[in-house]
């Protein structure tokens, strides 16, 4: 289904915070960039988020390994849903800084597992770390800062 620009599903403000669940995430991700990548949220809890990505051909660069942008998009999505759970009602957010280190390659058929942890939750920022594993091996580490946006009148 093709959506018009600016018409992607949004999580209603009244469903944020404690109501943020993997089921809500799945509905909101449908038809969006992370949803098209196949990002799944498995658990969204206090200070912790877990996600999964089954690697297939669309995730690979021409050399046959997972593209760098996929690592970042996967981790940023995990951190974003954790951020949403910890917002005050009516607030929004956006990523203002991120860093990713990839330690091990992933290929078609691998399943990546991400675990995000809230490192800092202030009034104006949240900092998240996301560790991505490929099997038993740490494959990537991601740290991002989210700026919290107050409601506009």
PLM feature spans:
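Terminal targeting signals and extreme-terminal segments of soluble enzymes
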Residues: 2-153
């Amino acid at each position: 289904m093709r959506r018009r620009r600016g018409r992607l599903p949004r999580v209603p403000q009244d469903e944020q915070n404690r109501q943020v669940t993997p089921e809500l995430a799945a509905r909101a991700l449908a038809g969006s960039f992370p949803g098209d990548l196949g990002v799944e949220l498995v658990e969204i809890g206090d200070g912790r988020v877990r996600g999964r990505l089954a690697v297939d051909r669309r995730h690979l660069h021409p050399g046959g390994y997972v593209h760098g942008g996929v690592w970042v998009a996967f981790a940023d999505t995990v951190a974003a849903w954790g951020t949403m759970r910890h917002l005050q009602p009516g607030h929004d957010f956006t990523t203002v800084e991120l860093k990713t280190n990839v330690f091990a390659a992933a290929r078609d058929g691998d399943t990546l597992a991400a675990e995000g942890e809230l490192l800092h939750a202030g009034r104006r920022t949240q900092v998240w770390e996301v560790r991505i594993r490929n099997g038993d091996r740490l494959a990537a580490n991601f740290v991002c800062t989210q700026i919290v946006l107050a409601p506009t009148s």
